[in-house]
């Protein structure tokens, strides 16, 4: 057959409603808003084409390869109920399109140029199904939930953290003092804020030293293993690794990375170093809302969460459901399960478009953080369960008596909620009562209860199904 030049509709090649998906295909669910006059089949096919083998015109080199083997296929389209002119387009990608063990390459293909495509008014990647064959090419989290519990020797309850505030402006010595007060009061972890890197008021090496001193002092006093998320994020990968190496030399248990601003390549390198050297890795999702907050354009956070589990991290921030940041309960629980569990069943009610089998890739602890305090503790314990990290920044440091009493209040509240739950009480219904009862035995908790009882951050969530 001679080569036929010219432009032809994408749907002639890339829309294949009869296609049977393979176990090895990467499957994607896109929310597509076509421009007026563009049929949904053409829009879905355009997404499949531009994110795989296609370009805008027929090229003679198409004849040198097997398009049938390598092309992405739009295999199903359904309208979004209640949304005029929006469709969910399902696309299957052959596994050979992707480099093994590279989240970077996977995203460059699937969410690359296609998002600027003229035929589409908007495009959002709602979910990805990672096939077992591809998941097995990733190391994933450096350690995972069980190994972390064993390292820390802490079982049967969520872990407690605190972000040190004010996030910017403290000297290293004062910062270390704040860390020590929180840890000795009963927290498991304290945390560098995401934008604490190495600024003129506090260089990274000084901070690492004073925080390590605080950790060792608090451990000696309490007999518990403590940690501080030392933020290794830096301007270059080499500098980031240098910071991680120094943390390991200090003998601390955990470092931290901003995975979206730092990038997946840097993150995967750091995760591999952490596994080889026994460091836990805490992941902050700074910049995620730029990508995931718009309902009809961007990438849903559940996809960013899956990508992080592949790239590697032991903790990741996952919203609170009850605090000051976005998050709708069922949807949040959907991606919390995707982070922790080995197998997750398809469940459109929770926004999960595909069943996902992680084939024993270690799990990630979800971190609830942002505007939460002791009155939220029963709800958080119920929603997130034991395998989570609950982080109270202002909710610890804002205590009227200072950091250590703030930490005591949180620890008492948590222990009370876990005990009540284990006794069979209903945290959702009796939560306030449980906290009040515990406050009778803890002056620190009752002082915290008095200061925060009226606080609410209640706006309707943007992220609905």
Curated annotation (Swiss-Prot):
Broad class of enzyme this protein falls into: lyase
Modified residues (N6-carboxylysine): 191
Any single Pfam family the record assigns to this protein: RuBisCO_large
Co-factor: note: Binds 1 Mg(2+) ion per subunit.
Alphabetized UniProt keyword annotations: Calvin cycle, Carbon dioxide fixation, Chloroplast, Disulfide bond, Lyase, Magnesium, Metal-binding, Methylation, Monooxygenase, Oxidoreductase, Photorespiration, Photosynthesis, Plastid
Post-translational modification: The disulfide bond which can form in the large chain dimeric partners within the hexadecamer appears to be associated with oxidative stress and protein turnover.
Any one GO MF annotation of this record: magnesium ion binding
Reactions catalysed according to its record: 2 (2R)-3-phosphoglycerate + 2 H(+) = D-ribulose 1,5-bisphosphate + CO2 + H2O; D-ribulose 1,5-bisphosphate + O2 = 2-phosphoglycolate + (2R)-3-phosphoglycerate + 2 H(+)
Active site: 165, 284
Binding-site positions, Mg(2+): 191, 193-194
Sites annotated Transition state stabilizer: 324
Residues the record lists as binding substrate: 113, 163, 167, 285, 317, 369
Misc. comment: The basic functional RuBisCO is composed of a large chain homodimer in a 'head-to-tail' conformation. In form I RuBisCO this homodimer is arranged in a barrel-like tetramer with the small subunits forming a tetrameric 'cap' on each end of the 'barrel'.
Protein name per UniProt: Ribulose bisphosphate carboxylase large chain
Organism this protein belongs to: Epacris sp
Gene designation per UniProt: rbcL
């Amino acid at each position: 057959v001679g080569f036929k030049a010219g432009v032809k509709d994408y749907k002639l090649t890339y829309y294949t409603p009869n296609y049977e998906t393979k176990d090895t295909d990467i499957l994607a669910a896109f929310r597509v808003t076509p421009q007026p006059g563009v049929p949904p089949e053409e829009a879905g096919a355009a997404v499949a084409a531009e994110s795989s083998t296609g370009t805008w015109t027929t090229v003679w080199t198409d004849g040198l390869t097997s398009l049938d083997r390598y092309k992405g296929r739009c295999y199903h389209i359904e309208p979004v109920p209640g949304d005029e002119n929006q469709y969910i387009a399902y696309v299957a990608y052959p596994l050979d399109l992707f480099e093994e063990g590279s989240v970077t390459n996977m995203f460059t293909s699937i969410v690359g140029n296609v998002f600027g495509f003229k035929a589409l008014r908007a495009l959002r990647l709602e979910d990805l199904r990672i096939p077992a064959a591809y998941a097995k090419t990733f190391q994933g989290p450096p350690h995972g939930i069980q190994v972390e519990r064993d390292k820390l020797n802490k079982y049967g309850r969520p872990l407690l953290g605190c972000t040190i505030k004010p996030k910017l402006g403290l000297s290293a010595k004062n910062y270390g003092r704040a860390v020590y007060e929180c840890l000795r009061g009963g927290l498991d972890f304290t945390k560098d804020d995401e934008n604490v890197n190495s600024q003129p008021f506090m260089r990274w090496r000084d901070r690492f030293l004073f925080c390590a001193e605080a950790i060792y002092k608090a451990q000696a006093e309490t007999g518990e293993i403590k940690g501080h998320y030392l933020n290794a994020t830096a301007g270059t990968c080499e500098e980031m690794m240098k910071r991680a190496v120094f943390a390991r030399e200090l003998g601390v248990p955990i470092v931290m990375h901003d995975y979206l601003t730092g990038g997946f390549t840097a993150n995967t390198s750091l995760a591999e170093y952490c596994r080889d050297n026994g460091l836990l890795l805490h992941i902050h999702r700074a910049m995620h809302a730029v990508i995931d907050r718009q309902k009809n354009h961007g990438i849903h956070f559940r996809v960013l969460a899956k990508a992080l589990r592949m790239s590697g991290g032991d903790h990741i921030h996952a919203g609170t459901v009850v605090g000051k940041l976005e998050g709708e309960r069922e949807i949040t629980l959907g991606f919390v399960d995707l982070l922790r569990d080995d197998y997750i069943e398809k469940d459109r009610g929770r926004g999960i478009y595909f069943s996902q089998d992680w084939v024993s890739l270690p799990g990630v602890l979800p971190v609830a953080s942002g505007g939460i305090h002791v009155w939220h503790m029963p709800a958080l314990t119920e929603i997130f369960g034991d395998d989570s990290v609950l982080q109270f920044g202002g909710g610890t440091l804002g205590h009227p008596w200072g950091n250590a009493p703030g930490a005591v209040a949180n620890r008492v509240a948590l222990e009370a909620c876990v005990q009540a739950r284990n006794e069979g009480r209903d945290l959702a219904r009796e939560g306030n009562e449980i906290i009040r009862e515990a406050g009778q035995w803890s002056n620190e908790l009752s002082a915290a209860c008095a200061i925060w009882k009226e606080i609410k951050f209640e706006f309707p969530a943007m992220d609905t199904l």
